[in-house]
Regions:
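Extended, solvent-exposed regions of the mature portions of secreted/cell-surface glycoproteins
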Residues: 23-148
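Secretory targeting and sorting signals
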Residues: 1-22
Length: 148
């Protein structure tokens, strides 16, 4: 009977455990009609990790795996470091509570966000680089008519 109770307890705990998903929630505006003339997007971030931050980068779409990203925009203007840790903010991280903006490029070295799909790749920062729990891929598109 003790073994049965122990097994039942383990099963109950396993069923009640939340699935693996990023705790940080990110909203992008605009997401699917980014201006070609003024390509700036705004992020609203909630649920940041308490002991480290996240990176947000403009990249080519990796397909189904976040680890599959091959080409990201090398421009510092197309990257964000977001953290609510004071020491990180002292080193240049943006607070997750304010207005977060990012300039994105239509084209960058090895990247074409007009004719292919681009994404914002979200990962844990250097303080938790091996932890993949915050990995997210958020697709975005430039708006308007392509005259090519």
């Amino acid at each position: 009977m003790k073994k049965f109770t122990a097994v039942l307890t383990v099963i109950a705990l396993a069923v009640s455990m939340p699935g693996a998903s990023a705790a940080t929630k990110i909203k992008v505006s605009p997401q699917f009609k980014v201006s070609k003339k003024n390509p700036v997007v705004t992020f609203k971030v909630s649920g940041l990790p308490k002991d480290h931050g996240i990176y947000i980068s403009q990249c080519m779409d990796p397909g189904r795996k976040p680890g599959g990203v091959k080409v990201c925009n090398p421009s510092e203007a197309s990257k964000l470091w977001v953290s609510n840790v004071e020491a990180d903010q002292a080193m240049g991280a943006k607070a997750g509570t304010g207005k977060l903006t990012l300039k994105v490029d239509k084209y960058f070295e090895g990247g074409d966000c007009i004719h292919t799909t681009c994404v914002f790749l979200v990962t844990n920062d250097h303080s938790a680089a091996d932890d993949r729990s915050e990995d997210q891929v958020i697709k975005f598109k430039f708006g308007g008519i392509n005259l090519f």
